[in-house]
Design a protein with these regions (language model features):
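N-terminal signal peptide c-region/cleavage motif recognized by signal peptidases
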Residues: 17-21
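Exported/periplasmic ABC-transporter solute-binding proteins
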Residues: 24-73, 80-83, 87-92, 96, ...
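Bacterial N-terminal signal peptides that target proteins for export
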Residues: 1-12
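Intrinsically disordered, low-complexity segments enriched in Ser/Pro/Gly/Ala and basic residues
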Residues: 1-2, 16, 56
Length: 257
C-alpha cells in the first residue's frame, strides 16, 4: 500500500450542484458536512426540477465550514455533522439560533476495501487492533477537529483501544478524504459514517461501533445570520420534508421524525 495518504488532508472537498443552470445571485448556497455530499447533490437536483431554484453546495469538514462562516464566507444554510460545531456557529452568531434543527442521524462503522479479504470484525473491548492493522494505518477524520474523527476517538476510548491505535492513525481533513484512503487501498481499514459506506461501491462495512460507545451522530442545520429570506426558508423546510427524507434514507441517514 502506498503512503501518500496525507495529501488527502490538504484541501476541503468543494462540490457545486448547478442542475444545468448558471450561478445567479438568488441561488441558495449551502455549507454542508462532507458526508452529506451525495445526498445533498441529489436533493439539489430534485429541488431544481421541482422548484426551478438552483442550490450551490460546498462540502468540507464541519469545523472548516464553521470557521469560514465566522470569517464571513457567503452561505445561506449550514449543516454540521455534529452539535459541537453548530454550538460554535451559534456562539459566534454565524447562524440564527431559533432556526437550529437536528435534521439527521447516522452511525459509525469500520470499513475495508471491497476488493480485500477482510472479514467481519466485532468491535468491543476485546478487539485485537494490533493484529487487525498488522502494522498498517487506520484512516479517520482528524480527531482534533473533524466530527467523524471526534466520534471515532470517543468510541475507541470507550472500547479501551485509543492508546494502542492512536499511533497508527492516518488523519484526514474530512470524512470523505478518510473514505478515499480506503477506496484507493492506501489503508486497510477506515472509520467513517454508515452513509459514507453506502455512497461508495469500493468499500465494505466490516464492523459497526456500538451506539453506546460514542455520543449520537447528529446533523443539526441552521439558517445563516441575515439570510432568513423566503427562498432560503423554503429550502430549509424542504430538507425537513418527505422528499428529502427519502433521499437521505437511501444514502443511509436516519431523518429526524
Amino acid at each position: 500500500m502506498s503512503s501518500n495518504y496525507t495529501r488527502w488532508g490538504v484541501a476541503a472537498l468543494v462540490t457545486v450542484s448547478l442542475a444545468g443552470q448558471a450561478v445567479a445571485a438568488d441561488n441558495i448556497t449551502v455549507f454542508a458536512a462532507a458526508s452529506l455530499t451525495n445526498a445533498m447533490q441529489d436533493i439539489a437536483s430534485q429541488y431544481q426540477k421541482e422548484k426551478g431554484v438552483t442550490v450551490v453546495s460546498s462540502f468540507a469538514s464541519s469545523s472548516t465550514l464553521a470557521r469560514q462562516l465566522e470569517q464571513g464566507a457567503p452561505a445561506d444554510l449550514f449543516i454540521s455533522a455534529d452539535q459541537q460545531w453548530m454550538n460554535d456557529a451559534v456562539a459566534k452568531k454565524s447562524v440564527i439560533t431559533r432556526t437550529r434543527y437536528t435534521l439527521l442521524g447516522n452511525d459509525l462503522v469500520l470499513i475495508a476495501p471491497r476488493s480485500a479479504a477482510a472479514k467481519a470484525v466485532t468491535l468491543d473491548p476485546q478487539t485485537d487492533w494490533k493484529t487487525l492493522l498488522h502494522g498498517e494505518r487506520l484512516a479517520v477524520g482528524d480527531p482534533d477537529h473533524v466530527p467523524a474523527g471526534i466520534y471515532a476517538k470517543e468510541a475507541l476510548q470507550k472500547l479501551g483501544a485509543w492508546e494502542s491505535v492512536e499511533p497508527s492513525l492516518a488523519p484526514a481533513n474530512n470524512v470523505r478524504a478518510a473514505l478515499a484512503l480506503v477506496e484507493r487501498n492506501e489503508t486497510p481499514y477506515g472509520i467513517v459514517y454508515g452513509s459514507d459506506a453506502v455512497a461508495s461501491d469500493k468499500v465494505k462495512v466490516v464492523g459497526r461501533f456500538p451506539a453506546n460507545s460514542h455520543k449520537p451522530v447528529e446533523y443539526p442545520m441552521a439558517i445563516v445570520n441575515d439570510h432568513d429570506n423566503a427562498a432560503v426558508k423554503a429550502f430549509y423546510d424542504y430538507l425537513k420534508g418527505p422528499q428529502a427524507a427519502a433521499i437521505f434514507k437511501n444514502y443511509g441517514f436516519t431523518p429526524t421524525k
